[in-house]
């Protein structure tokens, strides 16, 4: 059980909690840094809906201040293997932006997190983007995070009054193995999190999508058990 419970009068931070490993570690780090966590999970009608259950489990284990699961049906737009009837690639991590990229997803999600933060009187957002062991999504890059901070300064009441909004991306330059070790250091249960984009009918992770491959390799390099049941080899 994590032991980083913040003080009752600690500042609030909105943490995007997808239910994946990176977002779980991000929430744990926010607590370790002394923030009370407002966890925001977006139910965008994604293919891998099991990650919503993972987000609930993580929020409960961490004892966050509040956990909101916000419905936003991005299947109405499509354009991604996660939100449309497009096959999830199973042939390894490539160099091009894959079809699992959801158009502008992190921009949309951070905008919603910013709205909640402003309503709650918070000036801190946390997002678990990573620019090393990742699938090449453009909205995981450092320049995206820096650009969103600039946008938040222009678009919000706190910014217009001379304040700042900080977007914390503490995993941005970590390898997946380092993220796995952070989970262990924080006392988090890796098995609470979910990474697979295309779960098997029996509930196991496919084991061969980009996200599974990155997770498996990271935990193997770290010498840790990731608590996931895999199929697919």
Curated annotation (Swiss-Prot):
It comes from the Bacteria. The keyword Transit peptide does not apply. Binds 1 zinc ion per subunit. Its EC number is 6.3.4.20. It holds the Pfam family QueC. Its cofactor is Zn(2+). ATP binds at residues 17-27. It catalyses: 7-carboxy-7-deazaguanine + NH4(+) + ATP = 7-cyano-7-deazaguanine + ADP + phosphate + H2O + H(+). Keywords: ATP-binding, Ligase, Metal-binding, Nucleotide-binding, Queuosine biosynthesis, Zinc. GO terms for biological process: queuosine biosynthetic process. Zn(2+) binds at residues 196, 206, 209, 212. GO terms for molecular function: ATP binding; ligase activity, forming carbon-nitrogen bonds; zinc ion binding. The keyword Metal-binding applies. Pathway: Purine metabolism; 7-cyano-7-deazaguanine biosynthesis. Belongs to the QueC family. Catalyzes the ATP-dependent conversion of 7-carboxy-7-deazaguanine (CDG) to 7-cyano-7-deazaguanine (preQ(0)). This is 7-cyano-7-deazaguanine synthase. The gene is queC.
């Amino acid at each position: 059980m994590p032991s980083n419970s913040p003080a009752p009068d600690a500042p609030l931070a909105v943490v995007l909690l997808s239910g994946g490993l990176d977002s779980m570690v991000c929430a744990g780090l926010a607590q370790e840094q002394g923030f009370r966590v407002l966890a925001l999970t977006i139910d965008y009608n994604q293919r891998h809906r099991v990650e919503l259950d993972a987000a609930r489990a993580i929020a409960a284990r961490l004892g966050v201040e509040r956990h909101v699961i916000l419905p936003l049906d991005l299947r109405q737009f499509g354009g991604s293997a996660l939100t449309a009837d497009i096959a999830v690639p199973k042939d390894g991590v490539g160099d091009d932006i894959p079809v699992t990229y959801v158009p502008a997803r992190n921009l949309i999600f951070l905008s919603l997190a910013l709205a909640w933060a402003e309503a709650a009187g918070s000036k801190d957002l946390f997002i678990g983007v990573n620019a090393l062991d990742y699938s090449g999504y453009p909205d995981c890059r450092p320049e995206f995070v820096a650009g969103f901070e600039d946008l938040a300064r222009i678009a919000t009441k706190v910014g217009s009054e001379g304040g700042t909004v900080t977007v914390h991306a503490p995993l941005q330059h970590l390898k997946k193995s380092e993220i796995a070790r952070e989970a262990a250091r924080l006392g988090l249960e890796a098995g609470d999190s979910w990474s697979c984009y295309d779960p098997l009918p029996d509930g196991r992770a496919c084991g061969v999508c980009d996200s599974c491959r990155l997770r498996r390799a990271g935990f193997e390099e770290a010498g840790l058990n990731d608590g996931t049941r895999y199929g697919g080899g």
